[in-house]
Structure formats: C-alpha cells, structure tokens
Regions:
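Aromatic (often tryptophan-rich) hydrophobic motifs at membrane interfaces
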Residues: 11-14, 26-38, 150-257
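A gly/proline- and charged-residue-enriched helix-loop-helix capping module
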Residues: 11-60
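Residue-level detector of anion-binding/catalytic polar loops
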Residues: 47, 76, 116, 219, ...
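A conserved beta-strand-loop-helix scaffold within acyl/acetyltransferase catalytic domains
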Residues: 1-6, 53-196, 212, 229, ...
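Gly/Ser/Thr-rich helix-start
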Residues: 18, 140, 225
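A short, structural micro-pattern
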Residues: 13, 45, 78-80, 247
C-alpha cells in the first residue's frame, strides 16, 4: 500500500523487472500482454501499476514494443533515470583506449602503490566498508542486510561476483556485480574505504573487472544509475564517463486504474 492505495510493482525490492518475453515478440503480442496485465489488475482491485523496465541494451534483440504498448495503454513515465553503459571491446587494451587520462594515471598510481585486485568471497569485509560509506555519504543503510547478501551469494554463486581492491592485505574497495545475462554485467554495490582515497582503489578495480568481463565474453558493463528521481549526481556521472561510459534510460512506467 502507498498512500492507502494498492500497487502492483515489479518488484519494489529489485533494480528492475518486467515481462519475460521471447526475442521475436510481435507488436500485436506486446499490446496483448499489457492489456492482459491491466485486466488482471482490475480484476484484483489493484489501484496502480508500476514497472521499471530493463535498459534496451539488456535485450538480445533491441525492441521498444513493450514501452510502446505501455504508452498506448495510458501508462506514463513516472521517472526516467540514466544508467551508465560501457561497451567492452575485444581486448582490455582496446577498452583502455576509451579511458580518459585522469583514470589511466589513477590506475598506474594504484599499481605503483601496491594495490592488488581479485575476485573473492569476503562479503563481511566488503559489507563493513559499504555500511560505513553509505552512512557517511547518504545517512542510509544497504538495500540488503549482511545475512541476505551472504544468502544471495550462496544461491547464485555464478550470477553474483565480488571483486575487491587490497592494500597491504586489507580490503579497501569492492564492487558486487550481478551477471544479468550472457552479455551484460551490472554493478550493484560500489564502495570504498575513504581513508584510502589517495590510492584511487576503484579505478584499478574497475580496470581489473573489465579485464575479467572481456575474458568471460561479456559485451556490456552497466555501472548503474547516477540519477535519483531524475536528478543527476554530476560527480558520479563524470567518474563513470571517464571510463568511456555513456548514458541510457532506465524507465519506470506507472498507471492509475
């Protein structure tokens, strides 16, 4: 319930979600799907529907049919956030060419200072960094509890990957990645220990993750959104752009029934 009204939301605890559809979905079937959704919700006395669709580039075959069907059935854009997408080239050297000089320098500095990066399962150490960072920067707690995150890693060991930067044996930064499908990896949690800002640990960490992603045949790295309800965090957006990323929409549709 939101403001005493019932909502169908796909899903309120997830980054995004919509219909699970075949690659060759037709415009006719797209319209029918949305119409069936509306009929079902009305039959259950649901007041509102809210859907956050995956970015188009997650699809194997690009299509805006579902978006079109939503709009034709009087859904509206509740918000249009922007997520940062990096196309991964065939080699890490080719991908590195997209980096701006500041990020290249930061990577070299991290290596010179003795930073190392690796795939690991030390979720507790990462969570401590994440909690501290979110509290300092935003006064909030992580979406998942530590226990929930540990359980997710157990259930989906091939779909959730933690990469971390280490300095003198201590974890100083980490990124929890969700493997979305065969060609897309999404950064879900990004955090670092601010006491080690001078090492720029995230720069070398992302470089290492891109190298892993390329070797694993992924084609797109999604850094996640840098907007909150349409308001951009310019510093965060610039940080991602310096890796060669560009922005695409992550849309949320809504309708009142």
């Amino acid at each position: 319930m939101i403001d005493n009204k019932s909502y169908l939301i796909s899903h309120p605890g997830s980054t995004l979600g919509s219909f699970v559809i075949p690659e060759d979905l037709s415009i006719s079937d797209s319209m029918s799907l949305v119409e069936c959704l509306l009929q079902y919700c009305k039959s259950k006395n649901i007041d509102n529907i809210r859907v956050t669709t995956p970015p188009n580039l997650y699809q194997y075959r690009l299509s805006n049919y579902i978006d079109f069907a939503f709009l034709k059935n009087n859904f509206y854009y509740l918000k249009r956030d922007v997520t940062s997408i990096l196309y991964l080239e065939n080699t890490i050297d080719e991908t590195l060419k997209k980096f701006r000089p500041s990020h290249k320098r930061a990577i070299k500095k991290g290596i010179k200072k003795g930073l190392t990066c690796r795939l690991n399962t030390d979720i507790k150490s990462f969570y401590k960094i994440l909690e501290q960072n979110l509290n300092i920067r935003h006064g909030v707690t992580p979406t998942h509890t530590l226990e929930e995150l540990i359980e997710l890693f157990k259930i989906f060991p091939e779909k959730i990957k933690l990469f971390s930067s280490f300095y003198k044996g201590e974890m100083v930064a980490g990124v929890v990645n969700f493997v979305v499908n065969e060609h897309v990896v999404l950064a879900f949690y990004i955090s670092h220990n601010q006491e080690y800002n001078d090492l720029s640990p995230l720069n070398l960490l992302f470089f290492s993750m891109f190298e892993w992603a390329i070797k694993s045949n992924y084609k797109i790295y999604d850094f996640g959104i840098f907007t909150v309800d349409g308001v951009p965090n310019m510093g965060l957006g610039r940080f991602k752009e310096n890796f060669g990323a560009s922005g695409i929409f992550r849309d949320t549709f809504e309708i009142a029934l």
